[in-house]
Amino acid sequence: MKPENKLPVLDLISAEMKTVVNTLQPDLPPWPATGTIAEQRQYYTLERRFWNAGAPEMATKAYMVPTKYGQVETRLFCPQPDSPATLFYLHGGGFILGNLDTHDRIMRLLASYSQCTVIGIDYTLSPEARFPQVIEEIVAACCYFHQQAEDYQINMSRIGFAGDSAGAMLALASALWLRDKQIDCGKVAGVLLWYGLYGLRDSVTRRLLGGVWDGLTQQDLQMYEEAYLSNDADRESPYYCLFNNDLTREVPPCFIAGAEFDPLLDDSRLLYQTLAAHQQPCEFKLYPGTLHAFLHYSRMMKTADEALRDGAQFFTAQL
């Protein structure tokens, strides 16, 4: 798509989304566009500090979990001693950026609104980790906490997966992995998916939307994919292109959230339409006026806070 033919997104977004876009952090250096991945990761962590401030306090513990790839850090957010379930959270960042600090506020609010234990998994980033390593790390963490639930004083009889962007893909892929390989980690009561990518290679929204403001041009998306996958054949794997998996049976209840001006919106729409057509329990909600990644901005955006509350409410309704 010729750039001039794309929608004028920054003119169309909501007033509160514009406020976020125009919020300056004077102490922040410029984005290292030509820098190394390590430099971009460092910048992303610094930039997110402002947006993570003021999150609710609660009991928080960090644990290292063994996997066949080595130790993976996890962080437990415990809003109450007797949690009705445990939610595993997978952060976004195009598979190449992000960590437990960049998504701290999201996880704390999700724990607070659901009153469930939330476990963030600091999976190995790409290109250091190639598909399917990250999914195997997530599954290993689930199995570990299921086996050690009594020691960690968590309720693993009912679990869920949640994630934003690339983390949403990982959340659903992990749930399908457990189903397909018949791995018992407790009943998967629900999956919470905020503006994920699920396997479309092209779409109307991918053509009309995406630019420097969200890091989701066609070139950006190709770069993330090439960093994450091991080879070209992986593009058709049912744990990367989730539309190649069996979505007609035993899919856990899915909350699917879409951002109106997100180039990945059609992925969410297609996922919802596919699940609904096969009577799989699901709910789709579109958040008007929003850009991809809006969930980070609950400090300033009521819509972001609403989206987190909606996901938490959906999950607790499944328990």
Curated annotation (Swiss-Prot):
Its EC number is 3.1.1.-. It is found in: Cytoplasm. The active site is at S165, D262, H292. It holds the Pfam family Abhydrolase_3. It comes from the Bacteria. Keywords: Cytoplasm, Hydrolase, Serine esterase. One of its GO terms (cellular component) is cytoplasm. Its main location: cytoplasm. The keyword Cytoplasm applies. Signal peptide: none annotated. The keyword Plastid does not apply. Transmembrane segments: none annotated. A motif (Involved in the stabilization of the negatively charged intermediate by the formation of the oxyanion hole) lies at residues 91-93. GO terms for molecular function: carboxylic ester hydrolase activity. HAMAP family: Acetyl_esterase (MF_01958). Homodimer. Interacts with MalT and MelA. Belongs to the 'GDXG' lipolytic enzyme family. Displays esterase activity towards short chain fatty esters (acyl chain length of up to 8 carbons). Able to hydrolyze triacetylglycerol (triacetin) and tributyrylglycerol (tributyrin), but not trioleylglycerol (triolein) or cholesterol oleate. Negatively regulates MalT activity by antagonizing maltotriose binding. Inhibits MelA galactosidase activity. This is Acetyl esterase. The lineage of its organism: Bacteria, Pseudomonadati, Pseudomonadota, Gammaproteobacteria, Enterobacterales.
